[in-house]
């Protein structure tokens, strides 16, 4: 008996690589993770998902602004930076990718988060829950070769350090955390978007940030308002006159 052509067809198992992060704001570290993601995919599909969380302290950028900045900063990955309001967590990313027909999945993350995600994602494989359902043949969590750039206290340039630079109005150091190809206009826009999300005013002068050396500990205490209390009596050294402290700092 002659078989039909369809009998010879073997359905190919679709495989995808992805990452998920806060990226608030995006940094050169996130770019390296995306480069690692593409490299490990070796021509297979890959996707970049970002958190939709927003707050003044750790997530100053809105979801839409973050997507815009990511696509501008990393044009070679722009098409892989996904906009999907239904994906708010890494687990929801798996649900979305499973519904898209993928059956093998690989998550690329900082090496310090491998165990966390490996446990979490495999725990719900084949389990119906509030987040939805997925049932992959394989779930692998792979190291991007470095620590998560979203982690607090990461060595080098991290999102937490970038937020600190924006809060302290230090554009010079903030710009050092961006890819060299990012132009000044886009860098300033990101800087001000972060400040705006923190409830701070927009910066227009972008003066160089200069840290002056400590002249004396006594002077530093005076500047910080730690040397005297309001109403204290002081003797002016040059004239020996007695004065009253009315302003601190």
List each language-model region with its residue ranges.
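Nucleotidyltransferase catalytic core that binds NTPs
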Residues: 2-233, 238-244, 249
């Amino acid at each position: 008996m002659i078989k039909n052509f369809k009998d010879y067809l073997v359905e190919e198992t679709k495989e995808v690589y992805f990452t998920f992060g806060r990226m608030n704001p995006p940094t050169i570290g996130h770019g390296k993770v995306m480069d690692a993601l593409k490299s490990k995919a070796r021509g297979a599909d890959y996707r970049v998902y970002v958190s939709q969380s927003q707050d003044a302290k750790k997530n100053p950028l809105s979801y839409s602004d973050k997507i815009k900045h990511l696509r501008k900063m990393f044009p070679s990955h722009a098409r892989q930076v996904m906009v999907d309001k239904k994906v708010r967590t890494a687990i929801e990313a798996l649900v979305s990718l499973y519904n898209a027909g993928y059956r093998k999945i690989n998550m690329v993350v900082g090496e310090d988060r491998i165990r966390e995600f490996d446990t979490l994602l495999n725990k719900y494989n084949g389990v119906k829950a509030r987040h939805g359902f997925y049932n992959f043949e394989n779930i692998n969590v792979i190291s991007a070769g470095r620590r998560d750039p979203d982690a607090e206290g990461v060595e080098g340039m991290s999102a937490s350090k970038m937020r600190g630079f924006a809060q302290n109005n230090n554009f010079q150091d903030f710009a050092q955390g961006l890819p060299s190809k990012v132009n000044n206009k886009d860098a300033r826009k990101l800087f001000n978007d972060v400040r705006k999300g923190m409830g701070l005013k927009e910066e227009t002068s972008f003066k160089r940030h200069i840290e002056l050396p400590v002249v004396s500990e006594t002077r530093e205490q005076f500047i910080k308002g730690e040397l005297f209390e309001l109403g204290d009596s002081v003797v002016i050294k040059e004239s020996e006159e007695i004065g009253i402290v009315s302003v601190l700092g």
